[in-house]
Amino acid sequence: MASEDKKSKREHIIHFEDTPSKSLDEVNGSVEVPHNAGFWKTLAAYTGPGILVAVGYMDPGNWITSIAGGASFKYSLLSVILISSLIAMLLQAMAARLGIVTGRDLAQMTRDHTSKAMGGFLWVITELAIMATDIAEIIGSAIALKLLFNMPLIVGIIITTADVLILLLLMRLGFRKIEAVVATLVLVILLVFAYEVILAQPNVPELLKGYLPHADIVTNKSMLYLSLGIVGATVMPHDLFLGSSISQTRKIDRTKHEEVKKAIKFSTIDSNLQLTMAFIVNSLLLILGAALFFGTSSSVGRFVDLFNALSNSQIVGAIASPMLSMLFAVALLASGQSSTITGTLAGQIIMEGFIHLKMPLWAQRLLTRLMSVTPVLIFAIYYHGNEAKIENLLTFSQVFLSIALPFAVIPLVLYTSDKKIMGEFANRAWVKWTAWFISGVLIILNLYLIAQTLGFVK
């Protein structure tokens, strides 16, 4: 009988499960954690998932907004980046806690509490968000390949599909290898922009004042629009699903209160530390935009514009050099590659969680990748590889992210506030109401952004 079941599964490579397996089953509980070690050794064991989540906050889609914010309003919007990062820390900590306490990711929990039809609808919405996120990363990677190697954009877009093979190899080597590779790519981004900001010699006292909120952010319409862009990109819907899943990669006994409590503590520390690094990177991007482009008439609305400007002494002054431009392209490629790894993982989590679809890892990841590459490739062929036209896709991809946001944030706050689900680990009253307030503000801001992007609001 058992052999017949195995044969049946082989014949049906792609199938739907009545009872879904664990979230990211192949790596769930795969990382051992010490039980009686000191603080630093325990933290080292839990460090890793946070960096995978953090890359979503510094992907190519966020770059233009941050640099444009600095170029337009100097250091004034640093306070918006600070507030955005604090919001991200709260929501990502809640996502990790949901996964650790329940052993279910956000997609599985949402599906458990909705009908099959609703599960399918939510999957479509969230899958569109994954595609939107991936589009930004594909475009960023393809443009970086063109800038570095003069590779045609269409070829670069096709090459990005090979990311799937890299991820499959890393999964075979263990989840810690994925964490290490992504951490290395993020370190490259951090070092490149730290170096470029040091060369730009920003005004430090003026820079620090930028972290203090001020009324102009609300009263100045142009400043408000850019602020909305920064805040709107704060919470990436797929990151909440991802965070609730990869927090389960550490091996713990959920029947033991102390182990669960410790896992929540160290996962939260890891998440906050890595999101602090994302905050630093986004700050560096805005500071670079302010130090080099504020007061100039140069356009910094596209990656190619930024690349060219960094080697133009009439725009950035004496520090201009081809090396600065090349470093920018290297960081852009690192950002695109790190984000595609996490985006593909999130695609698997969402597909399995919402519609219980199981297929071989290579097929699932290839499908997720092709769903994102195809629209970009069609767009690139239609516009004959025109970078400006292709980068316009970035703007519209953000609309899908905004639409999907409520479908991630609202369930997250609901489930983590429910004592029947979370027991004593449910949100405290002040956390719950703070989260609801933040969620409401984020949703309103994103709806406003959609209306502006589509031209309904002037």
Swiss-Prot record:
Record's keyword terms, sorted: Cell membrane, Ion transport, Membrane, Symport, Transmembrane, Transmembrane helix, Transport
Transmembrane stretches, start-end: 38-58, 76-96, 119-139, 151-171, 180-200, 223-243, 275-295, 315-335, 370-390, 393-413, 437-457
Primary location: membrane
GO BP of this protein: iron ion transmembrane transport
Topology in membrane: Multi-pass membrane protein
GO MF annotation terms: cadmium ion transmembrane transporter activity; manganese ion transmembrane transporter activity; metal ion binding; symporter activity
Regions annotated as coiled coil: none
Any single Gene Ontology cellular-component annotation: plasma membrane
Location of this chain's protein in the cell: Cell membrane
Entry protein name: Divalent metal cation transporter MntH
Organism name: Lacticaseibacillus casei (strain BL23) (Lactobacillus casei)
